[in-house]
Curated annotation (Swiss-Prot):
Taxonomic source organism: Thermosipho africanus (strain TCF52B)
Protein name: S-adenosylmethionine synthase
General function of this protein: Catalyzes the formation of S-adenosylmethionine (AdoMet) from methionine and ATP. The overall synthetic reaction is composed of two sequential steps, AdoMet formation and the subsequent tripolyphosphate hydrolysis which occurs prior to release of AdoMet from the enzyme.
Cofactors, names only: Mg(2+); K(+)
GO biological-process terms attached to the record: one-carbon metabolic process; S-adenosylmethionine biosynthetic process
Gene from which the chain derives: metK
Length: 395
């Protein structure tokens, strides 16, 4: 049976993404000075104000005001007439120390306390910073090993920001959203783009027809592949007819409210934990990255066309309480064999994940817009395919 599936993305100027980028910029600043920083920073942005709060244990000193303003200005909120700008907005900060009760379990895992875990170094004794379940996914329907709807949505959002910032379309403002609907055939292969939707903030003196014509030429045509188009493809641009007031002055933004945009566009479940503002001892972040790393290597090794893994943790314990896989009927070998190989090859302890992916670095602001997965950036170590040969041995 044919089916339609839709995913969305947002630009870096979307209020929730402004909040995510501020939280991750603060995290980066702390990790740069003190890689052992424990950070959980939340941000709220609304008309004329940014509020930063959270729990932090660090030896670093960072200028919160300066980081917040610079991040907002870099995104493009540079003029007071936007209702929110980095020069004039108020910045409030309320940050306090991490709970010592949580630190007890993170600093030294339950297994280490009970003598079950003999680790080479302090990092490998780290326990999970919280309970929860994390999902990783990969599919061979795109070269990035990501679902096509979310990848096209991200690429449209990135292009929308690019043509705004480089002056190609000077009437655009920072806020924007994209959405792509893909038709899949009976074999679950993407065959065509059914609908492209772009909503973008703009200057008041430009018409909707001018916006649509410009976006088709400079954003949609360069991104949507010719082989996925037909004369039935629908293009929707600013369906309300007007989008002048946008950004935090129109919608309050909060850290962690775009978790589906951040991951797989709704193609698979999500454990619920957000990423931004959290240091890698928080398995909400590090275990999600590691689960993606495992899934991508499994699919790239040819063990399955689609692969999902769920990992779950208990606070203060190093080893996961469960690991589950699903190949959606696409496995090229026995699923039990795949799971056994994964558990032998990959170490799911938080400290081991941090070491393997080199996560104690100031790399996180780059993750905070346009997806944490599917981008081949040097800092995104979880996108590496360095375990493919090891996994191929089980075929």
């Amino acid at each position: 049976m044919k089916r339609l599936f839709t995913s969305e993305s947002v630009t870096e100027g979307h209020p929730d993404k402004v909040a995510d980028q501020i939280s991750d910029a603060i995290l980066d600043a702390m990790l740069e000075q003190d890689p052992k920083s424990r950070v959980a920073v939340e941000t709220l942005v609304t008309t004329g104000i940014a509020i930063v709060s959270g729990e932090v244990t660090t030896r670093a000193y960072v200028d919160i005001q300066d980081i917040v303003r610079k991040t907002i200005l870099d995104i493009g909120y540079t003029r007071a007439k936007y209702g929110f700008d980095g020069e004039t907005c108020a910045v409030l900060s309320s940050i306090h120390s991490q709970s010592p009760d949580i630190a007890l379990g993170v600093d030294k895992a339950l297994e280490a306390k009970e003598g079950e875990l003999i680790a080479e170094d302090e990092l490998e004794q780290v326990g999970a910073g919280d309970q929860g379940m994390m999902f990783g996914y990969a599919t061979n329907e795109t070269k990035e090993y990501m679902p096509l709807p979310i990848m096209l949505s991200h690429k449209l959002a990135m292009k929308l920001s690019e043509v705004r910032k480089n002056g190609t379309l000077p009437f655009l403002r920072p806020d924007g959203k994209t959405q792509v609907t893909i038709e899949y055939d009976e074999n679950d292969k993407p065959v065509r783009v059914d609908t492209v939707l772009i909503s973008t903030q703009h200057e008041p003196d430009v018409t909707i027809s001018e916006i649509k014509e410009a976006l088709i030429k400079h954003v949609i045509d360069p991104i949507i592949p010719e082989e996925l188009r037909d004369d039935k493809m629908k293009i929707l641009v600013n369906p309300t007819g007007r989008f002048v007031l946008g950004g935090p002055s129109a919608d309050t933004g909060l850290t962690g409210r775009k978790i589906i945009v951040d991951t797989y566009g709704g193609a698979v479940p999500h454990g619920g934990g957000a990423f931004s503002g959290k240091d890698p001892t928080k398995v909400d972040r590090s275990a999600h990255y590691f689960a993606r790393y495992v899934a991508k290597n499994v699919v790239a090794a040819g063990l399955a066309d689609k692969f999902m893994i769920q990992v779950a943790y208990a606070i203060g314990k190093a080893q996961p309480v469960s690991v589950m896989i699903n190949t959606f009927g696409t496995a090229k070998t026995d699923e039990d064999k795949i799971l056994k190989a994964i558990l032998e090859i990959f170490d799911f302890r938080p400290g081991a994940i941090i070491k393997k992916l080199d996560l104690l670095r100031p790399i996180y602001k780059k993750t905070a817009a346009y997806g944490h997965f599917g981008r081949e950036l040097e800092e995104f170590t979880w996108e590496k395919l360095d375990m493919v040969n090891e996994l191929k041995k089980i075929l």
